[in-house]
């Protein structure tokens, strides 16, 4: 399948600190991608590189087969909603739509006004007087009405209340289904939001890509296995240990494997997306701490 975003050895450095390093990835078309990771992991940096607002310090990135931001034609194919869902406080809702129509050649005027009507927004209302949820919806409307092939969303629901967040995600799902092959990348800390709308996961931690792939496939490859205390070396061959925890006479491992699962005195448990994400994030955090303490095997994990 054609890659919408493809990066090789991508890196970005700010004042001597690498915000993103050695990032290699390939995101296929037609996916709703959940971009997840801790604060400072490099998620916003990656999105800003993808839309052309930043330029790489190292490596390469191609978006829709071209360099990001490479001319008006390329810009028209990508929509971006930044973290603070920026709108112009002094302009009305209608002003925003007129501005969008003048600056985007593929602008869908009817769809934009229809969406504003469905949301119950007054076209005469100044954006500065809208609620946080309404501003987020307006920003999504502007990005969607330009009919992009790729839509990038940098934590657009972070400051919204549960009802506003639910409404925004519902709108996002509708937008994703309107056109075959459209790709959305949604950055969020709320894993339940990603479970609701995303079918592809991209996990960044420590400024590097740690996990990427279709959600269903990743979940199917990971398990928690619990049994009598033993070392990871006692596990069957072909199991990659993501996380391990030992308490008293019991051991628990989160593993990634396509090999047959252990039988006998092992208990095997399925993971959901939240379990999976947290396992990798905890592993990276604990591995870093353990490295500093010269003990990389005492990892705390879920029971």
Model feature map: region roles:
Residues 83-138:
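ABC-family P-loop ATPase nucleotide-binding domains
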Residues 167-255:
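ABC transporter nucleotide-binding domain
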Residues 5, 20-22:
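Conserved structural motif at the start of ABC-family nucleotide-binding domains
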Residues 58-74:
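Conserved ABC transporter NBD signature motif
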Residues 51:
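Helix-to-loop junction immediately C-terminal to a conserved catalytic motif
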Residues 151-155, 160:
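Catalytic Walker B motif of ABC-type/P-loop ATPase nucleotide-binding domains
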Residues 36-38:
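The feature captures the beta-strand-to-loop junction immediately N-terminal to the Walker
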């Amino acid at each position: 399948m054609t890659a919408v975003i493809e990066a090789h050895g991508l890196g970005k450095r700010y004042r001597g600190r690498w915000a993103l390093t050695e990032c290699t990835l390939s995101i296929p078309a037609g996916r709703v991608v959940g971009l997840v990771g801790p604060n400072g992991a490099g998620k916003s940096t990656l999105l800003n590189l993808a839309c052309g607002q930043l330029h790489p310090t190292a490596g390469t990135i191609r978006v829709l087969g071209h360099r990001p931001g490479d001319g008006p034609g390329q810009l028209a194919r990508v929509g971006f909603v930044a973290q603070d869902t920026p709108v112009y406080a002094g302009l009305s809702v209608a002003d925003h739509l007129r501005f969008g129509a003048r600056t985007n050649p593929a602008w869908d005027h009817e769809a934009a006004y229809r969406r504003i009507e469905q949301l119950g927004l007054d076209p005469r209302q100044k954006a500065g007087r809208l609620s946080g949820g309404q501003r987020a919806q307006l920003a999504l409307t502007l990005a969607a009405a330009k009919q992009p092939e790729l839509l990038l969303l940098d934590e657009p629901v972070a400051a919204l209340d549960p009802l506003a967040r639910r409404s925004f995600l519902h709108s996002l799902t509708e937008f994703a289904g309107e056109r075959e092959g459209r790709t959305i990348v949604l950055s969020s800390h709320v894993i339940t939001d990603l479970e609701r709308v995303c079918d592809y996961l991209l996990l960044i931690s420590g400024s590097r890509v740690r996990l990427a792939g279709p959600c269903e496939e990743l979940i199917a490859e990971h398990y928690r296995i619990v049994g009598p205390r033993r070392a990871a070396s006692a596990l069957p061959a072909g199991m990659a240990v993501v996380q391990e925890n030992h308490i008293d006479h019991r051991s628990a491992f989160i593993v990634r494997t396509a090999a047959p699962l252990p039988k006998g005195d092992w208990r095997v448990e399925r993971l959901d997306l939240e379990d999976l994400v947290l396992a990798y994030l905890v592993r990276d955090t604990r591995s870093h701490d353990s490295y500093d303490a010269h003990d990389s095997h005492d990892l705390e994990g879920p029971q």
